[in-house]
């Protein structure tokens, strides 16, 4: 696996997710790099499991991370097809509630737990990442597919 360096804000956010036992998966460019095709990425993509406990934990973490958000924001993390963006590239975090081609319930039990830059991370499995990339079908996703093992 490739050596991956994470910006300090990414590391801090991942540590908060882990401390609160949030159900999440690292997807996107960082996952592609982990599986052997390092490439430039403008953000860290996280797929968040949609359930009430997870949603409450995320809102708590966002407040701890310095965002002033109302408790009613919990509802955003309970709706499909949501993308929540924080920060600006290249240190932007995107949290998604749905991704193409796979379900969270199917992927989470098969997650890969590993350490990136000293932080424990839950990654989408290679098989599920490939299914997602194929289903999403953008040019960069198809390029990722060609270069993944």
Q: Where in the sequence are the language-model features?
A:
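Compositionally biased terminal segments of proteins
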Residues: 1-149
